Amino acid sequence: MKILKGTASARGMRVAIVGACFNGPIADALVSGAQQTFLDLGGSEDMLTVVRVPGSFEIPCTLKKLLSSGMEYHAIVACGVLIKGETSHYDLIADQVAARVSELSVEYGLPITFSVITAPSVDSAWQRAGIKGSHLGVSGMETALEMANLFEKL
């Protein structure tokens, strides 16, 4: 029996981060965490592309542009922050962004991790950005690299 598993190593991996700017400090923490994790896991700065977009809604079209640009990426991390407000805007954006990111990952056969925080409050969002617990930018990069290394074996 053959069991295949990826490792969270960035050595030799070309990776992109598409990070939304909306909800600034939290979004910046996600992108910074993903960047630092890439470097900590053996990646080099010249193999990392960071693209900042205005908001999470702009992530899917930017992913599509990157994927069709001719540049070969091993994985992409999509970072953003959506905080629930009093209107249905949050639900519409969260559902559409998640669906499109997933569709692009399947369509292109490329690991694209969904490191978009969807939270009921600012405090809850900060908890997912490493202040009091998990860090979605870090875990998103680790997962992206693990999947990229697994895909190299398939």
Curated annotation (Swiss-Prot):
**Cystine connections:** none
A cellular component annotation (GO) from this entry:
cytosol
Is Transferase one of the keywords? yes
What keywords are assigned to this protein? Riboflavin biosynthesis, Transferase
Spell out the catalytic residues.
89 (proton donor)
Transferase as a keyword of this entry, yes or no, is: yes
Q: Which reaction does it catalyse?
A: (2S)-2-hydroxy-3-oxobutyl phosphate + 5-amino-6-(D-ribitylamino)uracil = 6,7-dimethyl-8-(1-D-ribityl)lumazine + phosphate + 2 H2O + H(+)
Residue numbers binding 5-amino-6-(D-ribitylamino)uracil: 22, 56-58, 81-83, 114
Q: Where does (2S)-2-hydroxy-3-oxobutyl phosphate bind?
A: 86-87, 128
Name any one GO molecular function.
6,7-dimethyl-8-ribityllumazine synthase activity
GO biological process terms, alphabetically, are: riboflavin biosynthetic process
* Metabolic or biological pathway: Cofactor biosynthesis; riboflavin biosynthesis; riboflavin from 2-hydroxy-3-oxobutyl phosphate and 5-amino-6-(D-ribitylamino)uracil: step 1/2
Known EC number(s)? Answer: 2.5.1.78
Q: What class of enzyme is it?
A: transferase
Which InterPro entries would you find in this protein's record? LS, LS/RS, LS/RS_sf
Entry's NCBIfam families?
lumazine-synth
Q: What does this protein do?
A: Catalyzes the formation of 6,7-dimethyl-8-ribityllumazine by condensation of 5-amino-6-(D-ribitylamino)uracil with 3,4-dihydroxy-2-butanone 4-phosphate. This is the penultimate step in the biosynthesis of riboflavin.
Q: What does the sequence similarity comment in the record state about its family?
A: Belongs to the DMRL synthase family.
**In its UniProt entry, what is this protein called?**
6,7-dimethyl-8-ribityllumazine synthase
Q: What is the lineage of its organism?
A: Bacteria, Pseudomonadati, Chlamydiota, Chlamydiia, Chlamydiales
The coding gene here is ribH
